[in-house]
Amino acid sequence: LLQSMEGYSKQYGWQDLLLPWSYSAGVFDGEFYSAPKTYETMIMLYNKTLFEENGWSIPTNLTEYESLAKAIQSKGMHVFSYGSTGWQPTHEHIGGMYLNSYAGPDNVYKALIGEKKWSDPEFVGAVELLRKHMVDDGYWSGSLENYYALGWDDFHAQFANRGAAMMTIGTWTFQTTENVFKDISDDWDWAPFPNLTAEGGDPSYLLALGTTLSINGKSDNPDAAAKVMDFVFKNKAIVLDMANDFNFGEFVVPLKFTESDFGDNVNPKVKRYLLTFAEETGKGNYGYTTWTFWPSDPGVHIWKDMEVLWAGEITSQEFMEDHEKLWKKARKNNATLPVGKR
């Protein structure tokens, strides 16, 4: 069991130091128990050199997105590089992106807190669009079979070798992506995944916690543990230095970073991500990842049974009706996770 850190938070002023959403994610029954050590989000990497050569632009709505996909495929390349070998829950990465980008973060929030059903049309539509793009159109690595067959090293190599023009992945990829591009002439960059409605709109940055810091309920010296955490939260330079060692794939504490906090040794692409993420999520422009905000059973269902849907054994409507049943059970058993008020 964990010890409440509510008293330490008030003593040291942690709520003022952390990004609002990240602090709220650690509050249970009104008490602060869990401090974020690493945050992450889903992004869209793209081969910048390839885009410039072909005059392609980052899509901002569904029409532009599907038009770009056709243009990429007409060049004999895959739209995205990605795969699930070695980590079956990879499916939830893409599933969460579509739920937020198609149904919208406001609707996802309402479903998380029980004000909407997961079987509502906007969620069924999101899952069906993903099924179409994955199974029918082969956006990811050319086909569903290829997607299932590729692992971490495979899809990074495919992206770097122009086998695919883009890659949907989390920000934990920064270090690996930088490494696979360092010896080639092409350059890469990142963009938020587009809003998949017809009219487009501002894309959302999905909130996710990779690792957290807490105090063991049986700790013999909780005061010392709290002092260590306070030292981390109040020393941006040290946090950035440690995170930079991992090219910001780990130890990315969600502090309120500003331009002046970064040294010249930080990758400009990563720096832009950290500043943009802090600014946009601070304004409330954020969505939700399944591995941070979904309870256990629905969280497994969203990726495990996705394969049943993709195999054509059930419809998107049936898939989301089953998902809603698991959420009802989780609420009945008080097994849901805290979601900060939007």
Task: Enumerate the predicted regions with their spans.
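Alpha-to-beta junction loops
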Residues: 1, 76-78, 161-169
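Hinge/lid segment of periplasmic solute-binding proteins
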Residues: 1-42, 57, 66, 72, ...
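Mature extracytoplasmic/periplasmic domains
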Residues: 2, 172-179, 193-196, 211-296, ...
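Short, solvent-exposed loop/beta-turn-alpha elements that line the ligand-binding surface or hinge
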Residues: 4-18, 101-125, 179-183, 195-204, ...
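A structural signal for short loop-to-beta-strand junctions that line the ligand-binding cleft
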Residues: 12-50, 78-84, 200-206, 285-292
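C-terminal capping/gating helix-and-loop segments adjacent to ligand/active sites or protein-protein/ligand interfaces
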Residues: 27, 112, 207, 269-328
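Short helix-initiation/N-cap motifs at beta->coil->alpha
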Residues: 62-67, 144-160
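Glycine-centered hinge/linker elements that transmit conformational signals in sensory
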Residues: 69, 113-147
